[in-house]
Amino acid sequence: MHMIAGLLAGFPNFLLYFSVSIIFVLAFKFIYVKLTPYDEWRLIKEKQNTAAAVALSGAFLGYCIAISGAAKNSVNIVDFMVWGVVAMLAQIIAFAIVRFILLPRVTERIEKDELPAGIVLAAVSISVGILNAACMTY
Protein backbone atom coordinates (compact mmCIF):
# COMPACT_ATOMS: atom_id res chain seq x y z
CA MET A 1 0.00 0.00 0.00
CA HIS A 2 2.87 2.37 0.78
CA MET A 3 4.31 1.70 -2.64
CA ILE A 4 1.08 2.74 -4.37
CA ALA A 5 0.82 5.86 -2.22
CA GLY A 6 4.42 6.69 -3.09
CA LEU A 7 3.73 6.28 -6.79
CA LEU A 8 0.65 8.47 -6.61
CA ALA A 9 2.40 11.21 -4.63
CA GLY A 10 3.72 12.79 -7.82
CA PHE A 11 0.43 12.51 -9.70
CA PRO A 12 -0.85 16.04 -8.87
CA ASN A 13 2.39 17.55 -10.21
CA PHE A 14 2.12 15.37 -13.31
CA LEU A 15 -1.41 16.62 -13.92
CA LEU A 16 -0.37 20.23 -13.41
CA TYR A 17 2.66 20.10 -15.71
CA PHE A 18 0.89 17.99 -18.33
CA SER A 19 -2.15 20.30 -18.36
CA VAL A 20 0.01 23.39 -18.71
CA SER A 21 1.98 21.62 -21.46
CA ILE A 22 -1.21 20.90 -23.43
CA ILE A 23 -2.31 24.52 -23.02
CA PHE A 24 1.11 25.67 -24.24
CA VAL A 25 0.97 23.37 -27.28
CA LEU A 26 -2.47 24.70 -28.18
CA ALA A 27 -1.27 28.28 -27.70
CA PHE A 28 1.79 27.52 -29.83
CA LYS A 29 -0.39 26.12 -32.60
CA PHE A 30 -2.62 29.19 -32.53
CA ILE A 31 0.24 31.72 -32.47
CA TYR A 32 2.54 29.89 -34.90
CA VAL A 33 -0.10 29.48 -37.62
CA LYS A 34 -1.12 33.13 -37.22
CA LEU A 35 2.48 34.25 -37.78
CA THR A 36 3.10 32.17 -40.88
CA PRO A 37 1.95 33.82 -44.10
CA TYR A 38 0.08 30.73 -45.28
CA ASP A 39 -2.77 28.76 -43.71
CA GLU A 40 -1.20 25.41 -42.80
CA TRP A 41 -4.48 23.80 -41.83
CA ARG A 42 -6.16 24.73 -45.12
CA LEU A 43 -3.15 23.52 -47.10
CA ILE A 44 -3.09 20.25 -45.19
CA LYS A 45 -6.84 19.57 -45.02
CA GLU A 46 -8.01 20.84 -48.39
CA LYS A 47 -4.96 20.43 -50.60
CA GLN A 48 -3.21 17.50 -48.88
CA ASN A 49 -0.04 19.59 -48.93
CA THR A 50 2.76 17.34 -47.69
CA ALA A 51 5.31 20.15 -47.37
CA ALA A 52 3.00 22.10 -45.05
CA ALA A 53 2.28 18.97 -43.01
CA VAL A 54 5.98 18.20 -42.60
CA ALA A 55 6.87 21.81 -41.71
CA LEU A 56 4.07 22.13 -39.15
CA SER A 57 4.85 18.72 -37.66
CA GLY A 58 8.48 19.77 -37.25
CA ALA A 59 7.42 22.96 -35.51
CA PHE A 60 5.19 20.99 -33.10
CA LEU A 61 7.92 18.43 -32.43
CA GLY A 62 10.54 21.12 -31.88
CA TYR A 63 8.31 22.97 -29.46
CA CYS A 64 7.34 19.81 -27.58
CA ILE A 65 10.98 18.77 -27.28
CA ALA A 66 11.80 22.18 -25.82
CA ILE A 67 8.96 22.23 -23.30
CA SER A 68 9.76 18.67 -22.26
CA GLY A 69 13.23 19.94 -21.35
CA ALA A 70 11.63 22.82 -19.49
CA ALA A 71 9.37 20.46 -17.54
CA LYS A 72 12.30 18.25 -16.64
CA ASN A 73 14.56 21.08 -15.47
CA SER A 74 12.15 23.61 -13.96
CA VAL A 75 12.15 24.17 -10.23
CA ASN A 76 8.43 25.02 -10.13
CA ILE A 77 5.44 25.63 -12.37
CA VAL A 78 6.14 29.35 -12.81
CA ASP A 79 9.69 28.55 -13.92
CA PHE A 80 8.26 26.00 -16.36
CA MET A 81 5.83 28.54 -17.76
CA VAL A 82 8.57 31.12 -18.29
CA TRP A 83 10.67 28.56 -20.18
CA GLY A 84 7.60 27.51 -22.17
CA VAL A 85 7.28 31.07 -23.43
CA VAL A 86 11.02 31.22 -24.17
CA ALA A 87 10.71 27.99 -26.16
CA MET A 88 7.81 29.44 -28.14
CA LEU A 89 9.82 32.54 -28.98
CA ALA A 90 12.76 30.37 -30.05
CA GLN A 91 10.54 28.46 -32.49
CA ILE A 92 9.14 31.67 -33.93
CA ILE A 93 12.65 33.08 -34.33
CA ALA A 94 13.73 29.83 -36.01
CA PHE A 95 10.92 30.22 -38.55
CA ALA A 96 11.97 33.82 -39.20
CA ILE A 97 15.60 32.78 -39.71
CA VAL A 98 14.60 30.16 -42.26
CA ARG A 99 12.14 32.49 -43.96
CA PHE A 100 14.33 35.57 -44.20
CA ILE A 101 17.91 34.21 -44.21
CA LEU A 102 18.35 30.51 -44.96
CA LEU A 103 15.59 29.89 -47.49
CA PRO A 104 13.94 33.21 -48.41
CA ARG A 105 11.27 31.64 -50.65
CA VAL A 106 10.33 28.94 -48.13
CA THR A 107 6.74 30.13 -47.73
CA GLU A 108 6.05 30.13 -51.46
CA ARG A 109 7.73 26.75 -51.83
CA ILE A 110 5.62 25.23 -49.05
CA GLU A 111 2.46 26.63 -50.61
CA LYS A 112 3.53 24.93 -53.87
CA ASP A 113 3.96 21.66 -51.92
CA GLU A 114 7.72 21.50 -52.47
CA LEU A 115 8.63 18.86 -49.91
CA PRO A 116 12.34 19.80 -49.55
CA ALA A 117 11.33 23.23 -48.21
CA GLY A 118 9.03 21.61 -45.65
CA ILE A 119 11.78 19.21 -44.61
CA VAL A 120 14.32 22.03 -44.13
CA LEU A 121 11.87 24.04 -42.02
CA ALA A 122 10.97 20.96 -39.97
CA ALA A 123 14.64 20.08 -39.44
CA VAL A 124 15.47 23.58 -38.25
CA SER A 125 12.45 23.59 -35.90
CA ILE A 126 13.39 20.22 -34.41
CA SER A 127 17.05 21.22 -34.11
CA VAL A 128 16.14 24.43 -32.31
CA GLY A 129 13.87 22.45 -29.99
CA ILE A 130 16.68 20.02 -29.13
CA LEU A 131 19.16 22.85 -28.52
CA ASN A 132 16.59 24.76 -26.51
CA ALA A 133 15.85 21.73 -24.31
CA ALA A 134 19.56 21.07 -23.77
CA CYS A 135 20.23 24.66 -22.73
CA MET A 136 17.45 24.79 -20.12
CA THR A 137 19.59 23.73 -17.18
CA TYR A 138 20.63 25.15 -13.84
Residue ranges and their predicted role:
Residues 21-29, 90-95, 125-129:
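Alpha-helical transmembrane segments of multipass membrane proteins
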Residues 58-69, 122-138:
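Hydrophobic alpha-helical transmembrane segments in multi-pass integral membrane proteins
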Residues 104-125:
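Interfacial loop-to-transmembrane junctions
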Residues 43-55:
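Loop-to-helix transition at the N-terminal end of transmembrane alpha-helices
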Residues 6-24, 76-90:
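Alpha-helical transmembrane segments
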Residues 36-42, 102-109:
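Cytoplasmic membrane-interface regions of multi-pass membrane proteins
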Residues 91-107:
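Transmembrane alpha-helical segments of integral membrane proteins
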